[in-house]
């Protein structure tokens, strides 16, 4: 009897083993992780935090590096290596809200410009990504010997002509290729022409003549846009130095170098902060 029971149990065990071998074990499929493609020119080490209602006088966009709040003007380096610069997008292409880095507020957040208590907008969309070069400053105490105009007390502006729309508050690598010397109400307001490092045409554009070849007529469009945008508000057209010419890359890099040096003097205290800008 005992022998029969043991034989029966042995047979049952062999049956279960055979069943496990015959039926494959089901493994739950790996969970899909949706990847997000980020432009290689975007510097993802920085993030932004928005405070206050959008489209309001209280709205501010602050920058963070990890958990730490940082100033996009002071703590993001100007030079990115390999001939590239960092720039901060304030106004994405095909938008009209006049956003700017608030250089007189702690941590220099992005805010919308205000005039007579009202938020400012361009009369029409800007057709390029527009922003600023960190760690640069156009010194209002320095008059350009050739142009006879002093700096406008702001970081240097960037007009990024690439195909893709940037995002407000994005930090990107760009290649500078030229510069326009805009004179706005008697103040010198350099407009650096640049292209995003990951634009399909970036490798082809290394100087002004390359831009004219691969983006024919684009620099003239930039000049005309900035020349005329105040006219709908009843103001005169802006002027440009050097006979409206876009200066070459060598000249551009010298402008960037000089405005970076002016910034360093301001930040270090070698130049008095008589404009009461925020240096934190």
Curated annotation (Swiss-Prot):
It comes from the Eukaryota. The N-terminus is blocked. Its EC number is 3.6.1.1. InterPro entries: Pyrophosphatase, Pyrophosphatase_sf. It is found in: Plastid, Chloroplast. It catalyses: diphosphate + H2O = 2 phosphate + H(+). The keyword Plastid applies. Keywords: Chloroplast, Hydrolase, Magnesium, Metal-binding, Plastid, Transit peptide. Diphosphate binds at residue 120. One of its GO terms (molecular function) is inorganic diphosphate phosphatase activity. Mg(2+) 1 binds at residues 152, 157, 189. One of its GO terms (biological process) is phosphate-containing compound metabolic process. Coiled coil: none annotated. Pfam families: Pyrophosphatase. Belongs to the PPase family. This is Soluble inorganic pyrophosphatase 1, chloroplastic. The gene is ppa1.
């Amino acid at each position: 009897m005992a022998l029969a029971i043991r034989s029966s149990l042995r047979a049952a065990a062999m049956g279960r083993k055979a069943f496990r071998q015959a039926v494959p074990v089901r493994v739950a499929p790996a969970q899909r992780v949706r990847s997000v493609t980020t432009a290689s020119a975007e510097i993802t080490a920085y993030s932004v935090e928005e405070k206050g209602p959008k489209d309001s006088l209280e709205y501010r966009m602050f920058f963070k590096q990890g958990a730490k709040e940082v100033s996009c003007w002071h703590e993001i380096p100007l030079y990115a290596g390999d001939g590239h610069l960092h720039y901060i997008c304030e106004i994405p292409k095909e938008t009209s809200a006049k956003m700017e880095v608030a250089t007189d507020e702690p941590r220099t957040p992005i805010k919308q410009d205000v005039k007579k208590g009202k938020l400012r907008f361009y009369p029409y969309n800007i057709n390029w990504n527009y922003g600023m070069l960190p760690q640069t400053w156009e010194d209002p105490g320095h008059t350009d010997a050739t142009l006879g105009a002093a700096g406008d007390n702001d970081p240097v502006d960037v007009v990024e002509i690439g195909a893709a729309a940037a995002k407000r508050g994005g930090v990107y690598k760009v290649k500078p290729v030229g510069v326009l010397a805009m004179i706005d109400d008697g103040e010198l307001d350099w407009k650096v022409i640049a292209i995003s490092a990951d634009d399909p045409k970036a490798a082809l554009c290394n100087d002004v003549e390359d831009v004219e070849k691969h983006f024919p007529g684009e620099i003239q469009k930039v000049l005309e846009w900035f020349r005329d945008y105040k006219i709908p508000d009843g103001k005169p057209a802006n002027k440009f130095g050097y006979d409206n010419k876009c200066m070459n890359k060598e000249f551009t890099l010298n402008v960037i170098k000089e405005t970076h040096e002016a910034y360093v003097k301001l930040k270090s205290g070698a130049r008095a902060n008589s404009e009461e800008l925020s240096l934190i």
